[in-house]
Amino acid sequence: MVSRNHFLDPELVSKRVKATDSLLNDTHNPIRHLERGKIHLALGFPDLAATDAYRALTLFDSVLDSESEFPARKRIVPDALWNCAVYVDEQSEPNSDASANDSDVSIGSDEDEASESDSEFEDVTLSDYHEHIGNVYTLLVASLAQCGCMRDAYDFCIQGLKLEYGAEGNLAQPFLEKSIKEIQDAYVNQRRLRAGPDVRDGDIQFDPAGLQVQGHARRVVYPWNAHEPDRNSPEINIAPKCEVRTVNLPALHGLEADAENDSNPENREEVSVQLGLFAKEDIIPGETILHESSMLTATNRLHDDLCDACNSPLPELGSAEPSVACDNCDDTVFCSERCYKLACETYHGAICGEEGLASIGKDIQNPKDKADYLYLLLVARAFAMAETQKVHPLDLPEVKYIWGDFHRIEDDPCDAWAGRLPPPSATLPFSFQLNILQPMRILEEMGLDPFDSLRTYDTWVVNTLYAKFRGTASGRLSTWDGGPEVCAVHPLWCLANHSCDPNVRWEWGGEITFVARNETERVQWGSSEESERRKNDRGGFAIKKDEEILNHYCDLALVVKERREWAMGALGGPCQCSRCVWEESQS
């Protein structure tokens, strides 16, 4: 189990809670976003600080644009009085649901929010803008740079230097000028190291287009995340012949792919409590153990002949069970009436008729970006599912029990960031586009206010979804260019732990199936005596009662070093299965 918050300053965590409460009561006040962003940066979460700063910038920009869709305004009533009024109002309703203000309900769909009197708010003024805009740019640039998103940090430096600041904002100009020089110098130095000693200083020119776009965020269970399940919970039946149980796995964080060079025995002995699939009875070779379909799917092909729900191919014209088109959408088709009804119940209800969503993340030209945008589309589908089902996205059954390869929170994460060296937990890919801008756009296209929706769709929720999807989503490659084009999250498939000697094979279509491997399909490794012993122990069965059902996340034909490198992203460290340990000992 990952430690939660005992390595973070409890006073700062408390300040973060209070700042968030104030923000949720005053969502269109850019000063509230700025205040919380500073706390996030102090806590060692520059990714969250960057998002707060960008939201503050967006709202402050509306002060200069009277036509802005999201005008900046601030609550007149002090927080204490407002909270007291809300409490009195809730106590006066005998049938009020105690969970109505909990994070399980989307603020974006809460009609009570829209009924708030305009007399409780006043416009953010031009004076407010001049007083704070410099601090906004300072926080935004510093946070993006700490994450490693250098191109966006540079762009906002240039943008910020074009503005006129008030008395407070004058302090921002020297910082932005210094940041530009640091970014330029770092770029030139990196290129010089790559080019070798024969290149002269003047031969390398700064090119903003060559700056790094993708950085990293900490991949942790946030201290305020109350949605992670108890991984020591009772056994759960999920199919006729298998069930979910807890299992102690070796902790892989901190080990290198070439694990034989790891000299610290404690790294190999540390245990991580996870969930796994186990056989409830003996299973014969070739037996299908599990059929699992999922509505948590995504495709990056625009106008493709795939079912919008399950991503299976649409039936041929004239088939006995024809495809079904949504009457309220321009180009949303389902493979069957059953899929259409299930989609409406699980996700389509929240996005039906919202045509602006159709092009987001589709037909991406750069092959390197295709997988990243598929993960974005999975986040968008999770948003739609949560909004349709009126639950928090992290409480969706398809999401809740997935392990996100979370790391332990470091003792002093801020010290690592301050030294421009990301802490060990900063392994989650993070970019301004995919973690900040596009999720806000998705909420807008869904008809939600991205500021009023923070209780349910804040950036820490987005990051947690990304952490759960990366390494667990299954996919299919395009027959056109070989890049990923379809992916899906099958939570039970994800629960089956990895081994380089798996006892099941899996097939991906509109659903995933687990089939028990026969002897000819089992990986042959170890001495002939050991192989024969393992075969005899199985006693003619593929999987014996109480044995763990083991999946695989990499090409089993690779050598141990290559397998470990391939599966590092999904496992969080080098594989320590019996086969890998034995092959490592032989090499």
Model-derived segments and spans:
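Short alpha-helical interaction motifs and adjacent low-complexity tails used for partner binding
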Residues: 1-587
